[in-house]
Amino acid sequence: MAYFHKELLCCDEKIWKGKFPIKIEMFENLEEFVHGFYKTFMGYLKSDHKIDIFNSYLNDPKLGKLIRSTEFAKYIVTQSHLDAGIPTTLVHGDLWNNNIIFKRDSNGAISNDVEAFLDWQIVQEGNLVCDFARLLTCSCEGDIRREAETYIFEYFVDCLNTELKQVGKLPVPYTAKQLRESYEAVFIMHLMHPIFMMPLFFATKSSTPEEKTIDEARIDRCILRALHTCEDAKRYADSGKFDKWLN
């Protein structure tokens, strides 16, 4: 990501600026979006207790309103980063592990080096923090995501500024702290992603008898990932920073 944003900062912005508007229509009818995917998600919960837990998050007086607010979602993708002092840039829009190809090392094993990002169909000009939120909520278990959140923005800014220095460019005009502050609002908007992606993985999958218990364990893991996302989103919603969007 640092290399990608270095290339953007080094190229003539006329190449991309004004050519990839945000598809605002994606954020219409969020009430129907939340209701439809959560209804399907509930079919994977094995007990009334788990259903009650998720109901408490998705119908929370603050969090429940924010994830259904079209105006809040539009603010996040079009303006929140500017208010935080982060310039508008190109955003992949669907950056998660299934859309990343990694290089192989000399032994043919998968390395940590990225070969390419795939699936640019919703590339847009907006808040670069959206790519962090999509990547972390959709690709990581709760413990890994939470650990990554403690250092990922510092690491990104350090890598990006190193890339820029190598080509004689000035550092970016924002800090890791600004990215992290913007991330809280973006994270709330991404709450539903671990919930709606699970039915996409399992709804059409038929398990053999040998696979049944394996898939059950995978479903449990996805549920836990969604639960941890809900816990953190509620913490951000309860901070009071976004209360103006509750009216």
Question: Which role does the model predict for each range below?
Answer:
Residues 1-12, 156, 160, 164:
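A generic secondary-structure signal for well-formed alpha-helical elements
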Residues 122-166, 190-211:
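Active-site activation/catalytic loop segments of kinase-like enzymes and analogous catalytic loops
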Residues 168-189, 221:
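All-alpha amphipathic helical-bundle segments outside canonical DNA-binding/catalytic cores
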Residues 89, 96-138:
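Catalytic activation segment of kinase domains across protein kinase-like and atypical kinase folds
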Residues 184-246:
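Long, cytosolic, alpha-helical-rich C-terminal regions that act as interaction/scaffolding modules
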Residues 11-16, 146-147, 163-171:
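Short, flexible/disordered secondary-structure transition segments
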Residues 3-92, 102-111, 218-222, 226-233, ...:
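ATP-dependent phospho-/nucleotidyl transfer catalytic cores
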